[in-house]
Structures are given as structure tokens and as C-alpha cells.
Amino acid sequence: MGKKLVMAQKRGETRALCLGVAMVMCAVITYYILGTTMLPLYQKSVWTQESLCRLIETNIRDQEELEGKKVPQYPCLWVNVSAVGKWAVLYHTEETRDRNQQCSYIPGSLDNYQMALADVEKVRAKFHERQVFYCFSTTQENETSVLYQRLYGPQALLASLFWPTFLLTGGLLIIAMVKINRSLSILAAQK
């Protein structure tokens, strides 16, 4: 009976140890992936200065002029603000600025034109409700654009590091508990 109990205990310890090591390895892999993808974007972000923006005007643009002809396009919002003592164009995020510099806000779903237009009008109404809000600007002197929201800010970095840290801590705790259990069982067997 005693030998079966010891064998079962060893199998359970081995499984728990494997679980702990697997959790630690997953955390290390996740840290590596985040370190090569998210961290460089955070470090390269120039939108670090938080400023107070005042709304100047908003326009809904749904046509683009190409070669003198107006071509239908998805609806988007154009927002002009006063920030850091000068006129600037407000962009929703870094990606909005990269996708289309003629739009401050691009709706998420562009499949249905009417739904996209309703989304843009809702965002426009929110801007008109709050005339003064916080935005992010760069320290570059000649930059005439600001961001409403940073994609790669400190909150995003901390949120993405939460689960790997939780996994690493849990794995290390499991490994520590197995090692403590082994040493206590050896001490108990010696007495």
C-alpha cells in the first residue's frame, strides 16, 4: 500500500512539475513575441506629449476628388483642433493617420455605407458635446497633427504583459510547491 502511494505521489509531482515548466515556457515565448512586436512599436511612438485640444471644426467626408471628378468613398470624419497653441488635424490613432491622411476617424465596418455614415455622425456628435478633450502630440516642432488615442501607449503595453506575467508567476509557484512538497516528504520519511 505504501509503495503504491509513493508511486502515485511521484506521478502527480511529475505532472505538476511538467505543468509548471510548460507554463514558464509559454510565458517566456510570449515575452519574446511581445518583445519583438509590441515593444518596438511602443519605443518608436513619438506621440508622447499629452495636450489639451479644443475643437475647431468637424466635417464628414464621403467623396474624394480624383482628377477633377468626385468619386464616392467610405464616409469618414475630418476634425480640426487647436492643440499646443496651434492648429492641428486630429487623428483617431496612429493607424488612422497611416491609412488615410484625409480622414480623422474611419469607421470600423465599411461594408454598409449607411451604418458607416451613422457611426461617423455619432462620433461627430460626441466631439461636439465635448469641445475640450485630451489628445497626444509629438515634440516635433513642424508636426501639424495630433492623436486622440495612442495604440501603443503604456496601458496597452501593461495590458499585453499581464497574462504572460500571470502565467510565469503561476508556473513558478507550481514548481516551488512541488519542490517544497518533495523536500517535506523526504524530511517526514527520515523521521
UniProtKB/Swiss-Prot annotation:
A Pfam family hit: CaKB
Gene Ontology biological process terms from the UniProt entry: detection of calcium ion
Topological domain spans for side Cytoplasmic: 1-15, 179-191
InterPro entries documented for this protein: K_chnl_Ca-activ_BK_bsu
Domain of life: Eukaryota
Keywords linked to the UniProt accession: Glycoprotein, Ion channel, Ion transport, Membrane, Transmembrane, Transmembrane helix, Transport
Extracellular side: 37-157
Oxidoreductase among keywords: no
Family per similarity comment: Belongs to the KCNMB (TC 8.A.14.1) family. KCNMB1 subfamily.
Role description: Regulatory subunit of the calcium activated potassium KCNMA1 (maxiK) channel. Modulates the calcium sensitivity and gating kinetics of KCNMA1, thereby contributing to KCNMA1 channel diversity. Increases the apparent Ca(2+)/voltage sensitivity of the KCNMA1 channel. It also modifies KCNMA1 channel kinetics and alters its pharmacological properties. It slows down the activation and the deactivation kinetics of the channel. Acts as a negative regulator of smooth muscle contraction by enhancing the calcium sensitivity to KCNMA1.
Name by which UniProt lists this protein: Calcium-activated potassium channel subunit beta-1
Organism, as annotated: Oryctolagus cuniculus (Rabbit)
Gene giving rise to this polypeptide: KCNMB1
